[in-house]
Amino acid sequence: MHIDVYFYLVKSAHQKTGGIAMVEATSCGGVVIFRGKILLLYKNYKNKYEGWVLPKGTVEEGEEYKETAIREVMEESGTTASIIKYIGKSQYSFSTPQNTVLKDVHWYLMMSDSYYSKPQREEFFMDSGYYKFHEAYHMLKFANEKQILERAYNEYIDLKKSNLWGNKKYF
């Protein structure tokens, strides 16, 4: 969950319910893998929110979901990654003083070309790194991201078994 400025950049459908605006937001992110390890980011938002997360962010106007996922991975982690395949969608909601935000996140299995990462401090990311599946799974703060990680990692294993991982002509 990013407590950034989603409601300023998102396509929103404002429905007044009891004085609170309901805002629908769409983000995209990636489960980025290099040599079997998964990229995670550690976010500490003004000491109110902290934990390990997958890279994701808000879709900008005119942007395709794949473009958003690639851009957000680069912005939040400094990592260059390519899309392998669509994994699925997760949903959650959170509240701000002005709104209840209903968030859809579209996830992609992605491949990096190195272990390099540099967390985006301006967005309160304090650390980043690549971790083995079982480590990453237990480090992740949110259950919905754990489910996406599990789905993406199973796809990765299937591609590895078929000798298709890393062979870009198949994607």
What are these regions (language model features)?
Residues 18-54:
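N-terminal strand-loop-strand
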Residues 143-171:
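Charged phosphate-binding loop/patch that engages nucleotide di/tri-phosphates or the phosphate backbone
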Residues 29, 37-39, 66, 86, ...:
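A generic structural signal for ordered secondary structure
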Residues 3-21:
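Short, Lys/Arg-enriched N-terminal segments with co-localized hydrophobic residues
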Residues 59-147:
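Unchanged
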Residues 55, 61, 170:
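Functional cleft and adjacent loop/helix regions within the main domain
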